[in-house]
Amino acid sequence: MSSDSFQPPRPALSGVSGYRRFVASVVFAAPLLALIALWEVIVRTFDVNPRVFPDVESVVRTGLETIQDGTLIRHIGASLGRVAVGTSLAIAVSIPLGVAMGLSRGVSSFLTPLFRFFSVLAGIAWIPIATLWFGYGFGAITFVIFNAVFFVVAYNTLLGVSSIPLPLRRAAASLGASGWTMLTQVILPGALPNIVTGVRTGLGFAWRGLIAAEMIATNVGLGYMLFLARDFYRTEVIVFGMIVIGIIWLVLDRLLLAPLERATIERWGMVVRT
């Protein structure tokens, strides 16, 4: 038997990986727990007026009440539904347009100045005109989310397509790739890491635009919950809503978007798994 045929057993890494995940979780949670402890100490020590800032117990109690009566679930469902629709529409339009801009110098030259102009407008800047065009409700909020995502994803798609080396395209063409094959086997896989990064960034903008739009243009959603609580001086509801908004985004980003971006870069990008 040759020495090349012998494969020494690899050490089990499941325990090491589990320990690393545990350490990462502790490192992530420690600052949050410290912030909560500091919050409680300040409120108790200085006897802060609950209308100015509530204590931890009041926020927890309010949170449990909104969960039990179904209010929180209703607001979360409305907000997530709007984000899903607005983001999906933006992705469906922005990726083809970004690919077209990346493949055609003429299209890119014509549209790039428009992209630079509109990309500096924050999603919330569209709220006034969105309510004029679509009224108060789903249409206006979806339009705000669409604009928050569209330009980011389109621009990142353009960067991804433009970054594909020309020799790679020529090599694929010399092997007979053209048209649909070139697009699906070379262009899109090469641009995918940038596209996923754009989607991740755009969703962050969409989430912020959503909350702002819901404060003005609807009567259900997490943003509306915060705005309504403000009218009744319910600071405990406001703080709880802010915590929920942050938790939802962290869950989406850490459990869905970040792993997707990492896997995409490892599969089609310029890095390897270590």
Describe the residue ranges of each PLM region.
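Transmembrane alpha-helical segments of polytopic membrane transport and secretion proteins
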Residues: M1-P31, R254-T274
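Periplasmic/extracellular loop-to-transmembrane helix junction in inner-membrane transport proteins
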Residues: P8-R21, T45-L89
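Alpha-helical membrane-protein architecture signal
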Residues: V60, D69, I73, G77, ...
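Transmembrane-helix boundary motif in ABC transporter permease subunits
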Residues: V85-F115
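Generic hydrophobic transmembrane alpha-helix motif, especially the helices
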Residues: R116-V152, N156-G160
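Transmembrane alpha-helices
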Residues: F143, N147, W180-A213, E236, ...
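Short cytoplasmic-facing helical segments at TM-TM junctions of multi-pass membrane proteins
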Residues: N156-V199, L222, L226
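Hydrophobic alpha-helical transmembrane segments of polytopic membrane proteins
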Residues: L222-L260
